Amino acid sequence: MEELHAEHQYLSQVKHILNCGNFKHDRTGVGTLSVFGMQSRYSLEKDFPLLTTKRVFWRGVVEELLWFIRGSTDSKELAASGVHIWDANGSRSYLDKLGLFDREEGDLGPVYGFQWRHFGAEYQGLKHNYGGEGVDQLKQIINTIHTNPTDRRMLMCAWNVLDVPKMALPPCHVLSQFYVCDGKLSCQLYQRSADMGLGVPFNIASYSLLTCMIAHVTDLVPGEFIHTLGDAHVYVNHVDALTEQLTRTPRPFPTLKFARKVASIDDFKANDIILENYNPYPSIKMPMAV
C-alpha cells in the first residue's frame, strides 16, 4: 500500500477548518474560520517538507531564520536582503497605532531573535549591543545536545510575558522542544496562532530547517518535525485561494543539503543552504492581515 504524502496532513487540516471551523472576529478585523488544537508530523530523514501545492517563498524562509539566529529585531535589516515580510509590522504607521511613538521605524521590539538569544535581558532598542546579556537559549540547546542529549529540558521559548507589550507583534510560534534518539534530532513546535494560508507553510519549513541546521552542527541526522497548533485559522479572504490549493495533488518534496561543513550555528550563510528538486505548483496570492 502506497504511503500517503505528508503534505496531505496540511491539506486535510485546511479542509477541516473550511468545513467545520468556527467564525471568529479577530484583531485584524478580517475575520477567521478557526479550530483549536491540531497536529502534524513530517519526517526530515529523506526529504524536506516544503509544501508543493503552491510555491513557498524559500529565500524568505532562509533569510528570516538567519535573521532570527542573529538575534536581530530590525525589519530594515531583513528588507535589505530582499525579504519584506516584516515591513508592515515595523512601519511608522503601525508602530504609532500600537502607541510606540518613540520606537524607531523598523524596530520591532524584543521579538523572536531577541528572545532566542537574549531571553530576560532588558530591551533597549535595536542599536544596543546585547552581547552577554540574557539567556542564549539557542546556544544552550546546542551545548546540551553535546553534553546531555537525553535531557528533557531542551526548550526554546519566544513568549516572554514581560516583553509582550513591547513587541510589534507577539510571537505566533512560541515554544520549540528538541529531542535526540538513535543519533537523530527531532523538534516539536507549539504555535499558539496558526495562519494556515500564509504562516503555516512558512513555519513548517523554517523549523524543519532550524532542526537540520542544529543537527548539522551537533553531528546528528535530522529526525522529525512535529507541528502542534493552538488556534488554527483561515482568514476569510483566503478561503477562495485555499479552496483552489485543495484541488492540487502534492508532488514529491524537495531535498536539502549544506554546501560545506559549518561548525557553529552562527556561521551559516544563505548560500550554505541548498534546496534541490523543488517543483511546486504556481504560487497563490493571499493578502497578509496586519
From Swiss-Prot:
<feature type="binding site" description="in other chain">
    <location>
        <position position="27"/>
    </location>
    <ligand>
        <name>dUMP</name>
    </ligand>
</feature>
<comment type="pathway">
    <text>Pyrimidine metabolism; dTTP biosynthesis.</text>
</comment>
<keyword id="KW-0545">Nucleotide biosynthesis</keyword>
<feature type="binding site" description="in other chain">
    <location>
        <position position="203"/>
    </location>
    <ligand>
        <name>dUMP</name>
    </ligand>
</feature>
<feature type="binding site">
    <location>
        <begin position="152"/>
        <end position="153"/>
    </location>
    <ligand>
        <name>dUMP</name>
    </ligand>
</feature>
<feature type="binding site" description="in other chain">
    <location>
        <begin position="233"/>
        <end position="235"/>
    </location>
    <ligand>
        <name>dUMP</name>
    </ligand>
</feature>
<dbReference type="InterPro" id="IPR020940">
    <property type="entry name" value="Thymidylate_synthase_AS"/>
</dbReference>
<dbReference type="InterPro" id="IPR045097">
    <property type="entry name" value="Thymidate_synth/dCMP_Mease"/>
</dbReference>
<comment type="subunit">
    <text>Homodimer.</text>
</comment>
<dbReference type="InterPro" id="IPR023451">
    <property type="entry name" value="Thymidate_synth/dCMP_Mease_dom"/>
</dbReference>
<dbReference type="GO" id="GO:0006231">
    <property type="term" value="P:dTMP biosynthetic process"/>
</dbReference>
<dbReference type="GO" id="GO:0032259">
    <property type="term" value="P:methylation"/>
</dbReference>
<feature type="binding site">
    <location>
        <position position="195"/>
    </location>
    <ligand>
        <name>(6R)-5,10-methylene-5,6,7,8-tetrahydrofolate</name>
    </ligand>
</feature>
<dbReference type="GO" id="GO:0006235">
    <property type="term" value="P:dTTP biosynthetic process"/>
</dbReference>
<dbReference type="GO" id="GO:0004799">
    <property type="term" value="F:thymidylate synthase activity"/>
</dbReference>
<feature type="active site" description="Nucleophile">
    <location>
        <position position="172"/>
    </location>
</feature>
<keyword id="KW-0489">Methyltransferase</keyword>
<protein>
    <recommendedName>
        <fullName>Thymidylate synthase</fullName>
        <ecNumber>2.1.1.45</ecNumber>
    </recommendedName>
</protein>
<dbReference type="InterPro" id="IPR036926">
    <property type="entry name" value="Thymidate_synth/dCMP_Mease_sf"/>
</dbReference>
<keyword id="KW-0808">Transferase</keyword>
<dbReference type="Pfam" id="PF00303">
    <property type="entry name" value="Thymidylat_synt"/>
</dbReference>
<dbReference type="InterPro" id="IPR000398">
    <property type="entry name" value="Thymidylate_synthase"/>
</dbReference>
<feature type="binding site">
    <location>
        <position position="289"/>
    </location>
    <ligand>
        <name>(6R)-5,10-methylene-5,6,7,8-tetrahydrofolate</name>
    </ligand>
</feature>
<feature type="binding site" description="in other chain">
    <location>
        <begin position="192"/>
        <end position="195"/>
    </location>
    <ligand>
        <name>dUMP</name>
    </ligand>
</feature>
<comment type="similarity">
    <text>Belongs to the thymidylate synthase family.</text>
</comment>
